Amino acid sequence: MRSTIKRAIMAAETNRAFLEVRGLCKSYGQDEARVEVLKGIDVALGKGEVCVLLGPSGSGKSTFLNIVGGLESADAGSIEVGGVTITDLPPSDLVEYRRRELGFVFQFYNLVPDLTVTENIEVCQYLSPNPLPMDDLLKSLGLWEHRRKFPHEISGGQQQRCAIGRALVRNPGLLLCDEPTGALEYHTSKEILELMEQVNRDYGCTIVIVTHNDAIKHMAHRILRLRDGELVANELNEHILPARELTW
């Protein structure tokens, strides 16, 4: 498994696509009740690219994210992250790879109520052989002054910052976010999106954000749209994407 992770790190330093999804298919149910949720999705993202995946409820966005993150299996297709074809990994290696190399941020924070902000993040720090320095991370997330507080003592936005810190502390190459601002009011949502942009600048991880909110697309290098399980748009945001990355 260590050699697998080493290959992922080496691949991340090249100019190839960091995340490559080919022919991804997923359905639920059987026979007449069978529903195709993803229909042959092809996506390639560069290292450090921010991708916003848009689409109405039921379009397959969360299923796509779950499969890319190894939380669900695909019916067909392959997923390569940092040079590692994770769809080929046996279950035990996939679990270890996911813990070490992927970060997840969800709409609901799922913080441990009896742990402080620092302790909630430290829980995930030990899963990585190369974690980020805790003090630096807390400061960059604006949580330093709240580090000894418990979840019930901080706001929803601060709780989401803590959840982001929990995902980042492992120093992942790929950060997967499912409606990260869905439970927040407008002003706090704006702050969290600005934080995600800062995270991308500071740590260079590839970020995929799933949302139904078109307003989020301004922060993306790439904008994907799903409709009824099909990829109907794959657009580059040339206003913020460096020219050297306009090749994907």
Indicate residue ranges for each PLM-predicted region:
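Pre-NBD coupling/linker segments of ABC/ABC-like ATPases
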Residues: 2-13
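Conserved beta-strand-loop-alpha-helix hinge in the C-terminal portion
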Residues: 230-248
